[in-house]
């Protein structure tokens, strides 16, 4: 049986590994001891009890393949190199190293216990503060404003964004729907407002953003300035380039620099999709089908190239019952409101789904 090595145990890497588990000898390599369902970490800021269900062991993910804990320092079309110098050979290598984000929305290192401890500490700090400022008008900042204002309606929440509307890169209609709901929850929106100096860009802090913002007291500040692709592992490959977002440039079949039998997907890869779970639902089925055909002897050039979603889809809950979303269907997408957003994501944040995919029922032990 052909050997497939997947580097990175996030959403893309685990989904692809599961999809190929029955047709290849799959080895998934990940530095962390548990899968971090970081989509739910935003609500974890107001409800840290979620931690019992969003830090999920890898042991039950694959039936035939293997999940190995280790740090990958080198990749090629023939295999990978681990930090201890061990080399693992493979017939196909897929890199899905994902992206980084400020704490407490993603781990800052490989220790999942440290991530859990920090999220609990941030929650305790949040409960003690009356004034909250969120810097960043993208999905994380918008969702966080919705979660805090829903769970703590008595707190003063201000969302600061340098853009003229929320959710840059998406439709004005979506931005308007989310802005109206946030204002209805009492959130103050400060658009077209740049914050040039932050005490930290990587974790929450207590400090002023400037008197011009009119903060009533010194706020707890959450930086939510966007994801940063993790691409260092590609830099040793000759000819590999990065796009303006820092994502690895790929050919039509998701190969960096056209390297034979080396593929990339997810947040680190310039696929033409945004860095969202919605994007993964298109990339993984395509790559799984493509690699299955290759493993059966089909030449890659005879297979259809990857095509990103024609419309940027995204699900943006504002707490368990509110929010708005764009579904990547039809030519221009379909925008849906509170009920559909709650049903698709807001109520459960995919927690039961990922527990089930990893072999658990209600909690990960």
Name each model-derived stretch.
Residues 1-66, 143-172:
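Beta1-alpha1 glycine-rich phosphate/pyrophosphate-binding loop at the start
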Residues 2-3, 63-133, 211, 222:
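FAD-binding core/adjacent interface of flavoenzyme oxidoreductases
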Residues 9, 97-98, 225-226:
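Glycine-rich, N-terminal phosphate-binding loop of Rossmann-like dinucleotide-binding domains
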Residues 65-76, 80-81, 88, 154-252, ...:
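A Rossmann-like FAD-binding core segment of flavoenzymes
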Residues 111-130, 216-289:
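FAD-site-proximal beta/loop scaffold in flavoenzymes
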Residues 125-155:
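Rossmann-like NAD(P)H-binding beta-loop-alpha module
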Residues 265-319:
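A conserved FAD-binding loop/helix module that cradles the flavin
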Residues 314, 319-365:
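C-terminal auxiliary extensions adjacent to catalytic cores
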């Amino acid at each position: 049986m052909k050997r497939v090595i997947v580097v990175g145990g996030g959403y893309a890497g685990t989904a692809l590994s599961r999809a190929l588990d029955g047709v290849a000898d799959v080895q998934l390599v990940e530095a962390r001891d548990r899968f971090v369902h970081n989509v739910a970490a935003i609500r974890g800021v107001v409800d840290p009890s979620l931690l019992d269900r969003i830090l999920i062991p890898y042991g039950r993910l694959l039936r035939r393949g293997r999940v190995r804990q280790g740090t990958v320092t080198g990749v090629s079309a023939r295999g990978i190199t681990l930090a201890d110098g061990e080399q693992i050979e493979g017939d196909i290598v897929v890199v899905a190293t994902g992206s980084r984000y400020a704490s407490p929305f993603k781990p800052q290192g490989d220790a999942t216990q440290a991530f859990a401890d920090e999220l609990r500490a941030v929650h305790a700090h949040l409960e003690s503060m009356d004034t909250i400022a969120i810097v960043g008008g993208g999905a994380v900042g918008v969702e966080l404003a919705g979660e805090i204002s829903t769970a703590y309606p008595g707190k003063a929440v201000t969302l600061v964004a340098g853009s003229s509307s929320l959710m840059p890169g998406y439709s004005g209609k979506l931005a308007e729907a989310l802005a109206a709901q946030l204002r209805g929850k009492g959130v103050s929106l400060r658009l077209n407002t740049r914050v040039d100096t932050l005490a930290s860009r990587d974790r929450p802090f207590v400090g002023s953003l400037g008197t011009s913002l009119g903060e009533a007291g010194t706020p707890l500040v959450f930086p939510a300035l966007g994801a940063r692709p993790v691409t260092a592992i590609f830099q040793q490959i000759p000819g590999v380039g990065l796009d303006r977002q820092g994502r690895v440039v790929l050919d039509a079949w998701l190969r960096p620099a056209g390297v034979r039998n080396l593929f990339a997907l997810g947040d680190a890869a310039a696929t033409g999709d945004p860095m969202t779970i919605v994007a993964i639902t298109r990339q993984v089925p395509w790559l799984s089908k493509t690699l299955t055909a290759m493993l059966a002897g089909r030449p890659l050039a005879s297979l259809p190239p990857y095509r990103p979603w024609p419309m940027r889809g995204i699900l943006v809950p504002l707490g368990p019952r509110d929010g708005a979303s764009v579904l990547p269907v039809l030519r221009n997408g379909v925008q849906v409101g509170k009920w559909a957003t709650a049903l698709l994501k807001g109520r459960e944040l995919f927690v039961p789904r990922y527990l089930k995919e990893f072999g658990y029922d209600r909690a990960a032990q």
